[in-house]
Amino acid sequence: MFTRNKKKRIFAAILIIGDEILSGRTQDTNTSFLAKWLNERGVQLKEVRIIPDKLNTIVHSVNLLRKKYNYLFTTGGIGPTHDDITAFAISKAFKKKYEYNKEAYQILERHYKDSYFNEARKKMAKMPRGAGLIYNPSSSAAGFYVKNVFTLPGVPSILQSMMSFVEQLIIGGEKVYSVTVQVHLPESKIGKDLGKLQKKFKDLSLGSYPFFQSGKIGTALVVRGYSEKRIQECKIILEKILKKIKKS
């Protein structure tokens, strides 16, 4: 069951692993999904990195990010091919033996009982010693977790199907609130006043995002923070500022 510590602020990072992402051959959609998923559970995504399938790079990145944030989610590199080295790299990062996980092996063995259970398929059961399994309802290959590092597949549909289990393993934090104000004004006319408002509300995050709608240029202004009251105070002032700009 998912639990939340409403008084604690929780932060996370995502490490996307794969040459295919860096080359542009495969488009990453996991970041958007995970960002929304985490935010809904009171976990703020603070950093996203995309790195190649290089052992030393993965080890270095995992060790850096797992110490910096409450949670680290890795995606990609746990399949059956020669360049799927994420599980081995995480074993190195934690200085744990890279070996077959008995339960993961048995799940794969049952799944492939009517076909050839070859070495490539067996490889998907290898992970750091003592790792916990992240069960996979879409296929037989499990993900795994070691301490605060959650290792997931790169295929979006499979990753998404596994998050209901991940939810039971994490503790959410203080809820982040947000409000959006849309206005048919370009960012250039708002920027100066928005900067002044941000200085006044240092405990909030103010962002501006341009859009083009019905032949008109506009800006979506998003106010985010932990205090719903402060957000509403900021919104009232923001709307007054925008009204004044539109009249000028």
What do the predicted segments below correspond to?
Residues I17-D19, T74-H82, R224-Y226:
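Glycine-rich beta-strand-to-loop/alpha-helix junction loops that act as flexible
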